[in-house]
Curated annotation (Swiss-Prot):
This is Santalene synthase. Catalyzes a mixture of sesquiterpenoids from (2E,6E)-farnesyl diphosphate in fragrance biosynthesis. Catalyzes the formation of alpha-santalene, beta-santalene, epi-beta-santalene and exo-alpha-bergamotene, as well as traces of alpha-farnesene and beta-farnesene. Also acts with (Z,Z)-farnesyl diphosphate isomer, producing alpha-endo-bergamotene, alpha-santalene, (Z)-beta-farnesene, epi-beta-santalene, and beta-santalene. (2E)-geranyl diphosphate binds at residues 284, 321, 325, 460. Signal peptide: none annotated. It catalyses: (2E,6E)-farnesyl diphosphate = (1S,5S,6R)-alpha-bergamotene + diphosphate; (2E,6E)-farnesyl diphosphate = (+)-alpha-santalene + diphosphate; (2E,6E)-farnesyl diphosphate = (-)-beta-santalene + diphosphate. The lineage of its organism: Eukaryota, Viridiplantae, Streptophyta, Embryophyta, Tracheophyta. GO terms for biological process: diterpenoid biosynthetic process. It comes from the Eukaryota.
Amino acid sequence: MDSSTATAMTAPFIDPTDHVNLKTDTDASENRRMGNYKPSIWNYDFLQSLATHHNIVEERHLKLAEKLKGQVKFMFGAPMEPLAKLELVDVVQRLGLNHLFETEIKEALFSIYKDGSNGWWFGHLHATSLRFRLLRQCGLFIPQDVFKTFQNKTGEFDMKLCDNVKGLLSLYEASYLGWKGENILDEAKAFTTKCLKSAWENISEKWLAKRVKHALALPLHWRVPRIEARWFIEAYEQEANMNPTLLKLAKLDFNMVQSIHQKEIGELARWWVTTGLDKLAFARNNLLQSYMWSCAIASDPKFKLARETIVEIGSVLTVVDDGYDVYGSIDELDLYTSSVERWSCVEIDKLPNTLKLIFMSMFNKTNEVGLRVQHERGYNSIPTFIKAWVEQCKSYQKEARWFHGGHTPPLEEYSLNGLVSIGFPLLLITGYVAIAENEAALDKVHPLPDLLHYSSLLSRLINDIGTSPDEMARGDNLKSIHCYMNETGASEEVAREHIKGVIEENWKILNQCCFDQSQFQEPFITFNLNSVRGSHFFYEFGDGFGVTDSWTKVDMKSVLIDPIPLGEE
């Protein structure tokens, strides 16, 4: 055991609020930058109350849900055509019920995959596309060549397909599962996007028009499953061929899972207000946003340890980020970083009180999470956390030096550092620690594997697209858009479009990584995909994470706070 590990395992926990009086903090009189973030719109007394007054699920609803689960299992076992089985799987997944029927879904998809030699889907656009998407999502490779039958001799898609809106929509969604170099899927994406944009206002079926509009705003593959489930439950209710059993179970299950999440939110809110970090005026106070992100990554109730530790580490991480970005001087940040590298509190008395508070909160919470993992999972994860924190803070330190030195790095240099500074290697490693098979498996995340590299790079670039206007106004650190503008002389509009193109290309690489990263168990692959989906949710239309009173508020409230009305039973 090295010295840093020994320190982590034996160091006493320190109450940072015993050592720092935020009201008389000597830092307050100094000329410090401010993040200018608005106060949180979420009432912490209310959030804490969710621990004991959450959405309680009635006993009769639990019994009804069990009955309906049995009926759905019977549906999976009943004889049906392959397309009907695919559509059942699709609806179950989109309703957010896949965590209840993991075995049935896998058996159904493997059966369809094995029976593919007879080509039952051939010439049927919807069937071909749905089969392609669901099997690739499941980790079963289907070649892009299955779509050649819909192209002419020059490789163009037949314009007659534009009349088949349902098939077009399925092909559109399937195209986002493509890999780099799969030109047929690139053509499919461009073709279906153009056709659907020109057709959706004239679609007679309201439910189909609603689905098309929703998909064009953001494809299914890029959406957060838990948020999508809430939207789809309401949309599915309006469909003519809606299955009442699936709909009723989806509503009940959504509320039951939400009840679990609400209890966790309440307990986490109680912890957060004891840290003192919520009182720092320059930093973001975003506990509920952090929980929303953990819920995006791992909403399944069985991932409680992953969710809670991601929120705890993530909430502290946000304040550490703001400390580097807007608060600390270079000398202070160098001392902070060296203390993280030593994983020691010995020299932090040389730091100003506020940075001391942040360091001790980070140190304590990380050691506390490590001890919890030791208790619940049976292995020592603290060395893994220390490595991740060191890389995290060194990336922040580099950005601070760029900022204070007035240096604009090339896009590639910025991106390699930025994929770490975005924080997702640390957060995803936190999630991985909660589900790893054993201590030896923790070595798989150092050095950073491609799966983590590309998911984190995507989150960095998506974040940059959404936050660059606000951060430019604050005079904050550079973003990829500015680096590209400086490197090439491009306008901001051209640079923004370039970064969007880079995002699309890196999604293709990440899609392939999901097949190539066989050293990881499936939940961790999904964690990575979901982390990028969370980035799309928070940053697709601006800074929905830093600005709490934004468009994200409605979805967060519907997913985390408001249960679905069940109506008459």
